[in-house]
Amino acid sequence: MKRNQIILLILFGMLINGTTLLSQITYSGKGEVVAVRFLEMKENIDVSEFEKFAVEEFNSNFDRAVPGLKQYISKSDRGIAVDSYAMLMIFDSQIVRNTMIPNKKSSEWLNTIMEEKNLWSLWNKLSTYVTDESLSNYNDFVELR
């Protein structure tokens, strides 16, 4: 009888501790990740020229160019910062994002795609319109699952 009680206590302890540990996990790594960079224009930038670049060059070339990533420049039309710009990078999952950009640096695989499709030149051209800070400051939002 005592042996059964000990086994029951051990199982109960494992259940409680396991449930507590699992309840602290807020994401599985499988939910989408939305990386947001709020783009701040450099001084004396022609906004219509920037928007033309965004539509005709950046967005059209980045459109599904990298598997698992949807990336584009957008403009706010409602809310607290109307007429502001942001770059959205929507990764299929946190796992995909971490594979592409481990430790805040592009992977060799991602660099190869960026070079083959000449996407780095577009990224560099984007930096002629927006401040360096707006390209390096971002938030990644992970879908809770």
Model-derived features with residue positions:
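Short, surface-exposed ligand-recognition loops at beta-strand->loop->(often short) alpha-helix junctions
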Residues: 41-53
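Short beta-strand-to-loop capping motifs
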Residues: 38-44, 89-93
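Bacterial Sec-dependent signal peptides at the C-terminal "C-region" and cleavage site
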Residues: 16-28
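Bacterial N-terminal signal peptides
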Residues: 8-18
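Short, glycine- and small/hydrophobic-rich beta-strand elements in well-ordered beta-sheets
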Residues: 23-25, 59-92
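Active-site-flanking beta-strand signature of metal-NTP-handling nucleotidyl enzymes
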Residues: 30-40, 86
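An amphipathic, aromatic/His-enriched active-site/gating alpha helix that lines ligand/cofactor pockets
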Residues: 61-70, 90-137, 144-145
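Bacterial N-terminal signal peptides that target proteins for export
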Residues: 1-8
